[in-house]
Regions:
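FIC/Doc superfamily catalytic core
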Residues: 1-380
Length: 380
């Protein structure tokens, strides 16, 4: 059973846009379109990319049992001592950098090539081994140690399957399937090819995000899909393997997998919409409080600083506001006095926490079934 799956050439021969898939597809596409519009209400796109990519990085890494805390991640951003950052946090931060790098490579020409995928994996794992084969890549059942699937062990097959996948991703004439259905197929195919020695899962989930960008379903890499996968981890791995176990007679299993991904897109997009609305409300609140306090010294860079850096420090404020260090320190102290930041001393360093913004992300699980008025109660 471990080796019988024959990775298919794409496109698949099945009619995968069944009635059930089309119904769920409509819901998912509507939510994505709404998210795309809501994201444009945040004036500085880098705030959303930075904040949401970090959450995606943390949850995608958690799928692989690489666990860190939000506090560790934010503290790493203000620490001058790289040596004290724990290994899990470093891995998550590398993942975020991989999202950034991948996004910059695809946003202009809208091509998600194998070279881009290699660069993403290189950033995730800090190596440039490229596509390879290895018996150690066999996937095992974590409970009993059985080998449940062995990816291709012939490098020519890996290269051929990745070339076919690259065409399927980028050649719109190769398949007229809806992009979200294609994304589900792409993700499964990549997981089965397993082209790298390590980092396949995380790289594959970044490919999902970048695919939404190259197909113009989103302008920014902000769909927070890994949280859904983390919450449904057992089902995620079960459905991936179910397609392999049925081998060629697996149209039903493909439909179930596609429905799972589409439901994830709908749920995740809905949650992210509410989160973006919460950030927008909070930014407006801070602006209303700080404008009269700073008067003529107020600049939009002030708000950008507080939301781009949930944990900020004097050097960041000095750089963003283009002021002297002493002035930057005074600015931060004023914001603390206004109740919008909390000052924390660690060793010889001071950093300043945007507590309301951090609370918004800490309460993110609660946003799943709540409306904007509830978000307002969380951020106040």
């Amino acid at each position: 059973m471990a080796n019988k799956y024959k990775i298919p050439q794409l496109p698949l021969s099945y009619d995968l846009e069944t009635i059930a898939v089309l119904k769920q597809l409509n819901k998912a596409n509507k939510k994505l379109a709404e998210l795309k519009g809501v994201a444009r209400t945040i004036p500085n796109e880098n705030i959303l990319i930075s904040m949401l990519a970090l959450q995606e990085a943390r949850d995608s890494s958690a799928v692989e049992n690489i666990v860190t805390t939000q506090d560790d991640l934010y503290q790493a951003g203000v620490s001058d001592n790289v040596r004290i950052i724990n290994p899990a946090t470093k891995e998550v931060l590398r993942y975020r950098e991989a999202i950034f790098e991948g996004f910059e490579m695809v946003r202009k020409n809208k091509i998600l090539s194998n070279n881009v995928i290699r660069k993403v994996q290189e950033k995730v794992k800090q190596n440039n081994a490229g596509f390879l084969v290895s018996p150690s890549k066999a996937l095992v059942n974590q409970t009993d140690g059985r080998v449940i699937y062995t990816p291709p062990q012939d490098i020519d097959e890996v290269n051929e399957k990745m070339s076919n996948l690259e065409r399927f991703i980028n050649d719109q004439e190769m398949s007229n399937l809806d992009p979200l259905v294609k994304m589900a197929i792409i993700h499964h195919q990549f997981e089965s090819i397993h082209p790298f020695g390590d980092g396949n899962g995380r790289t594959g989930r970044i490919v999902n995000i970048l695919y939404l960008v190259i197909t113009d379903l989103l302008d920014l890499p902000i769909l927070y899909l890994s949280r859904y996968i983390t919450h449904h981890k057992g089902e995620y791995y079960y459905l991936i393997q179910a397609i392999r176990d049925k081998n060629t007679d697996n149209a039903k299993e493909w439909e179930e997998w596609i429905l799972f991904i589409l439901k994830g897109v709908e749920e995740t997009a809905g949650n992210t919409i509410e989160l973006v609305k919460g950030i927008s409300l909070l930014m407006a609140e801070y602006k209303n409080v700080l404008r009269p306090i700073f008067d003529k010294a107020y600049k939009h860079e002030l708000i950008n600083n507080l939301f781009f850096h949930p944990y900020t420090k004097i050097e960041y404020m000095q750089h963003d506001m283009m002021v002297q260090r002493k002035t930057a320190a005074k600015y931060l102290d004023r914001i603390v006095e206004a109740g919008l930041l909390e000052k924390v001393k660690k060793g010889r360093e001071n950093y300043y926490i945007n507590v309301k913004l951090c609370n918004l992300f800490l309460h993110y699980n609660e946003l799943s079934e709540q409306k904007t008025d509830t978000i307002e109660s969380i951020i106040k």
